[in-house]
Amino acid sequence: MPPIGTFNTMRIVCISDTHSMHRQIEVPEGDLLIHAGDCLGAGTLDDVADLNDWLGTLPHRHKIVIAGNHDWVFQEAPDHARELLTNTNYLEDSGIEIEGVRFWGSPWSPTFMDWAFMQDRGDAIDRYWQPIPQDPNVPITHLPLKPLSRRPRIKRQRTTSAA
């Protein structure tokens, strides 16, 4: 692999679902670290401060964080949680351009169980997903933008043979 920073490239490292166990993982080198949600376990402001401190120790030039369905504090105390994130760019239905690459982050997911950042399918969630620009190079969400249940189904045919 060429060294990081050569050939006008950006090496992006994406992690998610660390659930406050971020200090226990090895993060590969890169230019940009994306944490795509479920950063927290219990989801307290102290957990956010610890996440921020950890992010500050990583060598990546740029960092982006979005919330996920376990990251309640970003929904219940959003201003306080965001204030604690000084070592990253927190995206919530917003975007940023880094080195000419456009990123857009959204924490919203179709409702399943009773988690944070959930909206019912259809108009409710579309209210959050429709504003996503058509031109981000990298959309970042905690779950797929197009739920798997909307994928076309492939009809399979079983065959048996006598041996």
Predicted regions: what they are:
Residues 81-107, 111-121:
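Helix-adjacent hinge/juxtasegments
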Residues 45-49, 122-126, 158:
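Structural motif corresponding to alpha-helix initiation and N-cap regions
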Residues 15-98, 161:
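Core catalytic region of metal-dependent phosphoesterases/phosphodiesterases
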Residues 10-18, 34-36, 100-109, 137-142:
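Active-site-proximal beta-strand elements of phosphoester/diester hydrolases
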Residues 1-9:
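Short, Lys/Arg-enriched N-terminal segments with co-localized hydrophobic residues
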Residues 19, 25-27, 116-135, 141, ...:
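Active-site-proximal loop/helix segments of hydrolase catalytic cores
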Residues 19-20, 71-72, 108-111, 144-146:
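Short, solvent-exposed loop/turn segments at secondary-structure junctions
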Residues 40, 45, 112-113, 135-163:
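Active-site-proximal segments of metal-dependent phosphoesterases and phosphodiesterases across multiple
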